Structures are given as C-alpha cells and as structure tokens.
Amino acid sequence: KITILEKYNTSEATFTDVETCVASLYKEKPKVVVKRVASTGRSAIPPSSVNTGAKVNLGISLIRPLSGTLTSRFGSRWGKTHKGVDIGASKGTKIVAAAAGRVTVSQYGYSGGYGNYIMLSHGNGVQTVYGHCTSLLVNVGEYVSQGQAIATVGSTGRSTGNHLHFEIRVNGIAQNPQNYVY
C-alpha cells in the first residue's frame, strides 16, 4: 500500500484555521519554471514555460469564459505546475471565447490530459486554451468573437469531474489567469 502523502510526495501538516490552510496551498513564488516534455505523439499541445510572477500586458481585454466555482488555481499542485485554472460547472454548460481570435486547435481525444480542447490565437503571441470539454462548437481556421460559444463543459482527458481547464499563454509562457479574469 502507498499512502496519499507518499503518492503526492508531500508531508502532513496541521493548521488552526481554513485561511491558513488555503494560503499554504496557493503560495506563489515569482519565478519562471521551464519544463521540457519528451514527445510521445499523444499531445498536440507544445511544452510551455510558466510565469508565476507578475502580470504581463496582453494588449487585449479578456472576459471570463465561464461562470462557476474556481476549483483549482494556477501554480504548484501535487508536485507539478498547474498551468491554468479550473472552473467547476455542470456538464454541457456553454464555454465562451475569452477574447476574439482564430481557432488553431479543435481536437477530440485524450490530448496529453486536456481531453477534448480548443486553442485560440489572439495575435501578438497570446493564446487561450479550453480543456476537458464535452463538445467542441468551432473548427480550426474559424474566427471567433469575444463571448461566442466555442465548447461545452465536460470531464474528458485527465479529469475528476466536470470543469473547464483555462489557460492563458504569451509567447508559449503560461500566465496566471487570475491576473486577468478570475
């Protein structure tokens, strides 16, 4: 048998209140972590670096792609870096484009854990990723407007429940979506 502490390479901690516990889970260190992933041919999403520090000027305004409960934040999670935020919502809830842009990926399948996902390019190196979708409503090459429905919430890929995994990237570097929309 393996314990949860061993599985996630962590140690036991005791907290006196909820706020201290939550704060310890989401401590952010301003640094850039570069992860290189060996190609297995299973993921269409290229490896990216992660900016856990300052907000970057995107040159565009973003809206929330989904109203719901923030279930997982950007940053360190289970010994790895979570490159986006997870927003819980009911299966089939519409997901909208956070900004106008061109669809560069609209893919069904496991996709390296993202499941069915959409990637939009907004120009100037800015991209958004929408993962774990049930259905994809747009195709590669289409131009979408800000607020246009592009997919529906699901639990595809490496997922434990219905939610949207939402990422913002600038020149391949993952940014904290909470700096912009949540």
Which sequence ranges carry the predicted segments?
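Short hydrophobic beta/alpha edge segments that flank linear recognition/processing sites
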Residues: 87, 116-120, 145-157
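Short, well-structured beta-strand-loop connectors
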Residues: 94-105, 138-153
